Amino acid sequence: MTTGTMNVEVRPISARAAAIAITGDVTSASEAPLMDAYARATADGAKVVILDLGGLDYMNSGGIGLLVTLLVRVQREGRRLMAIGLSDHYRQILALTRLDEAIGIHDTEAEALAAAGL
């Protein structure tokens, strides 16, 4: 699904995990497609959602706010949110906002799955 300059693709990994690959720009305008992707990723009961941000070009404060909104939803539903593929720039932003304390940040999908015990 493409919206503006953001593209999301949902991919099941296992019965307990799914990935959402995000490419392009994440802004507040990305909320509907990202939340729809999350709903599709968890529809079959996945407890771990991995955001693949390797194709992220740009994220503004609205995009950071959207990650917070997603994180609250994930935690409320008893799931875990992880992220992979972050550039050094976006790793630093997540550290400055302390989102890295709530979102598991890993280099690869395999590392994220291992950290989740899958």
What function would you assign to each model-found segment?
Residues 1-21:
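Short beta-strand/loop segment at the start of cytosolic alpha/beta domains
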Residues 14-15, 54, 110:
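Conserved catalytic submotifs in the C-terminal HATPase_c
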Residues 16-17, 80-81, 85, 117:
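Long, contiguous secondary-structure blocks with strong helical propensity
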Residues 25-103:
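Amphipathic alpha-helical interaction surfaces in cytosolic regulatory modules
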Residues 31, 109-110:
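Residues at or immediately preceding the N-termini of alpha-helices
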Residues 104-108:
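Short acidic-hydrophobic, aromatic-tinged amphipathic segments that line or gate anion-handling sites
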Residues 112-118:
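A short, charged, amphipathic alpha-helix used as a generic interaction element across diverse proteins
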